[in-house]
Amino acid sequence: MVTLTSSSSTPNVSFDFMMNNNNNSNNLYGPFSSSSTSFSYLTSKEDALTQKNLMSGITNDVLGINKKASEDLEISVFGAEKYFNGDMDSDHSPRLVSPLPDPEVPIERIFVGPKQSSKNSSETPSLRSESSWNSQSLLLQSKYVEKKKNIKKNSSCNSYFQEKDMSSNHKVSNKKSFLATLGCRCVCSNWSSVDVVDDKRRSSGLKKIKTQLSFSGDLSSEMKIHQQQQEAMLEQRKSLEIFGSPLIEKRIIQKKFPWEYSSSAKKEEHGFSVKYEEEEDGSVSDVSTDLFEIESLTGKANPFLARQGSSDPDSPDGYAPSEVSIQWSVVTASVADFSVMSECATSPVKKNRSFQIPRIPIMAKSNREIAPQRRKSSSSGLLMGCKSHKSVRVSGDSYTSMNRTPSYVPRFPVEANPTSTETRRRISSSSVSHTQSPFLYT
């Protein structure tokens, strides 16, 4: 005989099926076929239902068992439907309902709290658990302080622990390292130790600054040595092509002062005598007379030359008049046919004659040599004085041409030899002209 019961959602109905094997015929009897047997089964089912109703209040609090019982009942319902539909040919025995929970089971093992462990151990805590709990409490306290002050520090113990939110009561994962179980005190476990690490970092920063300063001092010394080496190399590389030689510089300076160079250089290099210097002065005056001759032929004196001679009386540009210049002035005056006497009378040159004839300190001769020359020029009278003034005025322009050619080049080969007969003849002829000059204008 098989008993099937429905779930709590359906009405409680029991069906009894009896099979008569004595008659060798499969006769299926419906419920209440026999009064004696059916009554006995009904009473037993009623007792079971009453017990189930009593336990329904308890099973509402027990979530896991109630869910499991409902699943078993649903499965049994599906099995009954298959049985009535005739689909359970292979399996003639339907699935039985799981037995109801025993009311004598203690409540402690049935009720499971949501935040409690699945089992309550009544054993005493061991040394290992106490050490792990102490280390865990220290670590949680240090982490709480760090989060409160918003300080994030990296340490070697961060790899062994997993931080959780503050709302979860600072729980840590079940995976603990070997060092945590032994209760080690790491760098992050104490606040004072963290300060010590910070101090060490600051000291290391100061050391870095010191090393940089020392390196900069060494660098400055190396730069000084390198600069000294470059200066030494530049001194060795000095040559005539780049910086010039002192001899060339000396010659350039001497070219700026040709009167100094003409006297000193010729004495040192050639060794001419004093007579040659007198002849050189005469040749310079000859060059000036050529220019004066051109001026006299035009019949008009150049005012620029006159201003040039009178504007700077103290300049060493002029030369003392010589006999040859006086001779050429007399000849040109007679050819131009103009009165030199009238010009001398109108011009105030005679009064300022001392200022019109400047002296050169280096080229000038000694007082003993100049004195007879002055006497000769003054002995000829007023006419000679005017002609000397003409020669002096031209000498300023002649000196500008001498600046262009500082070295004296004689025009004729006879002038190179001051002791020749030609120069003596010219000197004698000039002396004769001095004696005859007053009679030209009678």
Curated annotation (Swiss-Prot):
Interacts with PKS1, RPT3, PHOT1 and PHOT2. PKS1, PKS2 and/or PKS4 are essential for phototropism but not for inhibition of gravitropism under long-term blue light irradiation. Residues 110-130, 394-442 are annotated as: Disordered. Keywords: Cell membrane, Membrane, Phosphoprotein, Phytochrome signaling pathway. Expressed in leaves, with the strongest expression on edges of the laminas. Not found in roots. Residues 121-130, 428-442 have a biased composition (Low complexity). It is a peripheral membrane protein. Its main location: membrane. Induction: Up-regulated by white light. Acts predominantly in the phot1 pathway. Involved in the leaf positioning and also in the phot2 pathway controlling the leaf flattening. Component of the network that modulates the very low-fluence response (VLFR) branch of phyA signaling. Regulates phytochrome-mediated photomorphogenesis and hypocotyl phototropism. May act by controlling auxin homeostasis. Residues 397-406 have a biased composition (Polar residues). The gene is PKS2. GO terms for cellular component: plasma membrane. InterPro entries: PKS. Disruption phenotype: Increased hypocotyl growth inhibition and cotyledon unfolding responses in the very low fluence response (VLFR) mode. Reduced phototropic response. Reduced hyponasty when grown under blue light. No effect on negative root phototropism. Auxin accumulation in protoplasts. It is found in: Cell membrane. This is Protein PHYTOCHROME KINASE SUBSTRATE 2. One of its GO terms (biological process) is phototropism. The modification Phosphoserine is found at residues 239, 245. Belongs to the PKS family.
